[in-house]
Amino acid sequence: MTGGHHFLAPAMEMHRLATTYEPTGMLQVGADFATLPEALQLHADAMKVTLEKADAYWPVDPAIVDLLGQIHALQLRAAEMARELTPAFEQLHDVDLTRLHNPRKSAQAEAMWDVSRNL
């Protein structure tokens, strides 16, 4: 058996990126969270192509096609669920986000309230 990189190589790259991710601040984290629905949708779209090819061209048992369909449905559900992340992030961190977007006097002055400066 040869190959195996079709699914594995991109997943390994995603894992590498996740383990080396060092956001500069929480606004970046929020912005990155906002891209998760699209990323998961693209992943589901790729699975749909695989599912369609398996169904139309590959000599696999129909049960395999069914399993791929179930996997695709779960991926679609994950993309849908990820759409809840940004509104939740904004709601649950409203006070922090308001302060970042509307600092008192200036960003430099607001930084004096930074927890790390007051421990």
Locations of the language-model features?
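Eukaryotic extended alpha-helical scaffolding/oligomerization regions
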Residues: 2-119
